[in-house]
Amino acid sequence: IYLREGKGVVIVDTYFKEIDLGDKPVFDHYFSLRHYENSEFTFTNMFIWRYAFNLRFTIIEDCLCVIGKFGKDFHYFFPPIPGENSRVDIAVHNLIQYFKEHGYPVVMKGITHATREMLEEAVPGLFRYERDFNNDDYVYRTEDLIHLRGKKYHQKKNHINKFLKSYQYTYEPVGENNIEECIQAELEWMKNKDPIPGLEDEKVAVLEALRNFDALKLKGGALRIDGKIQAFSLGELINPEMAVIHIEKANTRYHGCYAMINQQFAEHCWKDVPYINREEDMGIP
């Protein structure tokens, strides 16, 4: 989403704060007031990726406003998250002015159909919209991820069948008894990976989620093979009808391990939730 030229804005002095764990009640309050489905609109997501994307926030006219930076110079902000007595129009204009004062192009990310409608009601015609295919969320029916029926899931089912024939495993919930094992597994797996852009940021995000598992109120599942944890997944409810999977890691030495933790986590933890947002593509055509 980009600013259309020729629209007036107000001048403000806005201070943005770094996100820390103590801010969870503030974020949870704003996110709870409306039915959000995109994975970015959770405190966990913004907290664990705060270093990677330099995420900061402020409150403007009872709107939660979050800004970020991707790479060296791609600055952006998320749509304001309105409170109970908010002025989205003023919040938007303040964000625009902040970006202009700092010489940043005015770019907003994380737009959904619902937030676009909110923006068009508050500031009609101010923005033009472009599809961001690289950051689509992928939402599945939970029962589909559990049973993997049909041609669409045939490849995943084959991976699981091969896994079951090859390995003896146990599933267990993630908790205080095995968090440290999950941390050590992640560190060990990362040692064997070639350095690629974003890999270190991913490691930081995974470790933040694990080390703050209880405080973030996450749920998790893990697979144990040969006495060691070889896969784990972490998620939470984003609304009463949808869970979001924030983290999914597995030892690729075990064929089908990713497919197996995906299926097992859905079955053991989310079977009573209609939908699962996996944040990004599973590789299903």
Annotated model-derived regions:
Residues 123-197:
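Acyltransferase donor/substrate-recognition loop-hinge adjacent to the catalytic core
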